[in-house]
Amino acid sequence: MTDVASSTPGWITRLMARLGTTGWIGLASFTAFTGWMLIALLVRSTSSERYIFLTDVHWLLSRFGLAVAAVMLAVAVYIGLIRHGDVTAWFRRITYTIFAFMLLQGVVGGVMYLMGGRAGEDVHIIYGYGVVLSLPFFIFVEVTAKKRPAMGSYIWGFTMLAAIIVRCITTGPPA
C-alpha cells in the first residue's frame, strides 16, 4: 500500500511546506471570500443588483483594509522597533494575503468602472493603483534587502497603505 506522502507530486509537497499554516489560512480565507463573492454575483438577477452588491463589497473591503493596515503597522512597529526583530515567515505570509485582498479590491473597483460606475473624484482610480502596488514594492525591498533586520520596509509599507486607503476613501463616491 502506498502512503499519501510518496504518491504526492514533489511540487505540491514543496508548496505545502513553503506556505505553512498561516499561508494556508490566508489562501483559504481568500478563496472562500472570492467564492462567496462570485456565488453572490451569480445569484443576482439584474446588473443593477450586481452593481449594488459590488459597491457594498468595495466599501467593506476599503474599511477592512484600513483596519488591517493599521493593525499590521502596529505589529511591524512592535517587531521592528520595540523587539528589534526581523520579518517572520507568518508576517510575510499575512502580508501576501493582504496584498491578495487589495488586488481583489482593485478588481472589484475595475469591474464597477466597466459597469459604468464612476468615483467621486478621478484621482480615486490613481489612489486605487497605489493601494494595489504599494505592498509589492515594499515586499520586494524587504526580500532583496542585504542588511537585516529589514522590518522598516513593512513599517513604511503599511504606513503608506493606510494613508493611501484613507485618501481613497475620501475621494470615492459619497456614501
Positions of the model-derived regions?
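Structural signature of hydrophobic alpha-helical transmembrane segments
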Residues: 62-67, 120-132
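Membrane-interface helix-boundary motifs at transmembrane edges
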Residues: 82-92, 143-150
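Membrane-helix exit/interface motif
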Residues: 75-82, 106-118, 137-141
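Membrane-helix boundary connector in multi-pass membrane proteins
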Residues: 114-122, 136-154, 170
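Hydrophobic alpha-helical membrane segments
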Residues: 101-104, 124-138
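Juxtamembrane boundary at the C-terminal end of a transmembrane helix
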Residues: 44, 163-175
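Hydrophobic transmembrane alpha-helical segments in integral membrane proteins
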Residues: 20-30, 40, 49-70, 172-175
